Structure formats: C-alpha cells, structure tokens
Amino acid sequence: MRQQYFVKFCKETDQRAADRDSWKTFSGLPQELELPSAPKQFIQYLEEDNRPQVSLDVDYENGMGISVGRLREDTVYDWKFVGLSHNTVRGAAGGAVLCAELLKAQGYITKKL
C-alpha cells in the first residue's frame, strides 16, 4: 500500500540528511532479536525521484520491509514522503506471524506442559 505521509516538527530544523540516515540505519526489536520473519533491514530509503514504486519495491525483504522515498519539504507541514509496504504480507498475515514470534521471544507464549 503506497501512502503519502506528512511530518511536522515542534522545533524548526533542517533534518533532511539526518532523516535519510536514520531511515537507512533504523533497527527495531524484531531485528535485534533476529526473529525468523523479521526483515534484516526494516526500512530502505530510495533516492530516486520516482521511487518507491509498487512494481519494483513492494517485495522488499520478502514483503516484510518498508520502502520510503521522495522526502521533500512541505509548505503546510515540515516534510512529506512516500511510504510503501505490502498490505497482505507486512500488514495482515506477516504482521500477525511477526507479533507471535515477538511474543514467544519475550516469554509471553510458552510451551504448555
């Protein structure tokens, strides 16, 4: 599902380069725990002006990753960008599996004795 997002910061700042680096290096708990269905790199930032595109980027990290691009300044908010994820793989089925893996890894789901 491709969406356009808007971001407004509390303080006036130019975070364009920092934001790109943050997206490129972001790692969450599923990556730290190396869960089986977690993508190795959760977010990929694409520099091209025409990316992300569904036909090229929806299957990033077997559909479990997020593709982000077209970061630009906005007149109403501070920044806007486009985000793309696979609605079925990342959203419904894969998201549920990843949640179950995380619950097991954190000890909320245990083997019944």
Residue ranges and their predicted role:
Residues 50-113:
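C-terminal helical cap and adjacent loop that interface with cofactors, partners, or active-site loops
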